[in-house]
A protein has these predicted regions:
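An N-cap/entry alpha-helix motif that binds or orients negatively charged groups
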Residues: 1-57
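Alpha/beta enzyme core
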Residues: 30, 37-326
């Protein structure tokens, strides 16, 4: 038998790490932080084991815990003390994210990314200003152009509070361009935008909506988030956000959309982000709780696959645990 090519030669323990094509680092990771203006104590998120909402007063302590694990970047989500039809608390000077970011920026060295959307702030749970009659007519949805002004106001308020990067997530047409213009006008031309460029209307978001109290009161988000079936549409969405000035391009969710991540990496020189979402996190925990999987191993392999597909940064609820093992 003449086997000149034997790939197993490079699988021994000594050489395996030398020829590994992909590796994870703590600098690849972004940890989500949920700040809740409705509570004075930490509240565990039942559907996301190990995750919790923290009051504004605990936000710095929470970020310090993440930093001690080795993760330097966070993304902040807010749960406001009150909601209304237009989501006005989202851009309030004394809003939950604004107050938390001021504290975190002043007292830690964390790199602070802020999520820019309206779903946590509207009493209807949708990601923008509603068209007239949308709460009773399923043919109606979010008013795209009216929502753009709100997103620009939110972004500017986060910038004023000290955010290091703005991350619009609503899948509203034109959101990146409008936010870029608003930031530039206010003197924040050097503040980068990480766009949720290809965000699908996914069943994997369930636990997050519990965590952030942002589930729609009626209907769904099919009219503005992408159809999971569409890859060509993802390319179009990504191209539009790149043209409008996005500095980082994100795919959400991550694991079911690695084909989109890989194509984005091939086609663009922008940094690529992927969001390892709550459902991806929760299902691994559920399987591990049944004894079917080893959680540390499958978490590492899942994030490694996202990195291998082409992601430069990964937003993940596994950030702290993985960082400690790395």
């Amino acid at each position: 038998m003449d086997l000149r090519d034997r790939p197993r030669r490079l699988r021994t323990d000594g050489v395996r790490p030398l020829v590994a094509e992909t590796s994870l680092s703590t600098t690849d990771l972004v940890a989500p932080v949920f700040v809740d203006a409705t509570t004075d104590e930490r509240v565990a998120i039942e559907s996301m084991p190990g995750q919790e909402r923290v009051p504004i007063e605990e936000s710095v302590a929470r970020v310090e815990e993440i930093a001690e694990a080795g993760v330097e970047a966070i993304i902040v989500f807010g749960i406001p003390e009150s909601k209304d039809r237009s989501g006005t608390r989202a851009w309030a000077n004394d809003g939950v994210v604004q107050r938390a970011v001021r504290r975190i920026s002043a007292e830690t060295d964390a790199y602070v990314i802020t999520d820019v959307c309206l779903c946590e702030y509207t009493d209807h749970g949708h990601c923008g200003v509603l068209e007239e009659g949308a709460d009773s007519d399923p043919r109606l949805t979010v008013d795209n152009d009216a929502t753009l002004d709100s997103l620009a106001r939110i972004a500017a308020s986060h910038a004023e509070a000290g955010a290091d990067m703005i991350a619009p997530s609503g899948m509203i047409d034109g959101m990146v361009g409008r936010i870029r213009s608003a930031l530039d006008r206010e003197g924040y031309e050097n503040l980068p935008i990480m766009s949720y460029a290809a965000k699908s209307e996914s069943a994997f978001y369930g636990p997050f909506r519990d965590a952030a109290d942002g589930a729609p009161a009626f209907g769904d988000r099919r009219h503005y988030q992408m159809d999971p079936a569409n890859a060509r549409e993802a390319r179009r969405e990504i191209a539009l956000d790149a043209e409008e000035g996005a500095d980082v391009l994100m795919v959400k969710p991550a694991l079911p959309y690695l084909d989109i991540v890989a194509e984005l990496r091939r086609e663009y020189d922008h940094p690529v982000a992927a969001y390892n979402v709550s459902g991806e996190y929760a299902m691994l925990h559920a399987a591990a709780d049944r004894g079917w999987l080893s959680l540390p191993e499958v978490a590492h392999e899942s994030l490694l696959s996202i990195k291998r597909a082409g992601a430069d940064l990964i937003i993940t609820y596994f950030a702290e645990d993985l960082a400690r093992r790395l």
